[in-house]
Amino acid sequence: MKRILLPLLLATVSLTSSAAGPLRIAILGDSYSTFEGYMSPAINELWYYPADSKRHNKANDVVSVEQTWWMQVTGRLGATLVQNNSYSGSTIAFQGYARQKEAANDGHSLRPGHPADYSPRSFIARAVNIGDSIGAPDLLLVFGGTNDSWAGTPVGDYQWGRWTRADLFTYRPALARLCRDLREMYPAMRVVFLINEGLRPEIVESTHVITKYYGYEYLNLSDIDKQGGHPSHKGMTSIADQVCKYLKGE
């Protein structure tokens, strides 16, 4: 496991908020961070469901929200979960998975076998909806890039501004745009990007370079047990262990 802590953020390592109350945490993620009844907005697509739900994937043993990595993290740190805006299948870039059939015009591609336009569910689109009536959280944990890697999203070029819509269908420009937006909208918020194991090397390297450029942190995760391609209860606990260890500076 590798990690980086940037000098710019050394003053924000404290696990209490600036108001001396509990640390306020938000999650921006994909299917790995979903659970029915805990997403905001509630219409987000999910992967994890309670054991008594007809939609629960019996191949995976995560059956309660208490088993999720993010609920374990907030519980162990005595933190407040401000919001979890995670969306199953979502990508950082606008490009999604290849179409299985012809679909309505989404402004990018119509033909089967061509990538779908995932811009409405993208991390960029959802980044504008972070926080609650009190304001932005103290800490945002961003857990994405997995679907970009699995969907074969092109990495594109390193680009730090003047992005066109076409640019945002590639990973590097999209991640840079996401980081820029977060920096402008929530300048005082600490942001840590969590990086799944087993991703394409160019996705991992790009995440390192771009998050560092914008003064954000990243944590490379490892040893995540999975069932059905998604963290099992054991895998969720492994993620929580690594995140808590990192946030505590251990």
Question: How would you label these PLM feature ranges?
Answer:
Residues A26-L28, L140:
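Conserved beta-strand elements of the Class I
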Residues L5-S18:
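Hydrophobic h-region of N-terminal signal peptides that target proteins for export
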Residues G21, G107-E250:
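Alpha-helical cap/lid subdomain in secreted, periplasmic
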Residues D30-S31, T146:
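Active-site metal-binding loops of divalent metal-dependent hydrolases
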Residues E36-G37, A151:
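Short N-terminal helix/helix-N-cap motif within the alpha/beta-hydrolase-1
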Residues Y32-T34, G235:
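Short active-site segment of divalent metal-dependent hydrolases/proteases
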Residues G29-D30, I130:
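Active-site flanking residues adjacent to catalytic metal/cofactor-binding acidic residues
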Residues A42-G156:
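Conserved SGNH/GDSL esterase-like catalytic core that processes O-acyl groups on lipids
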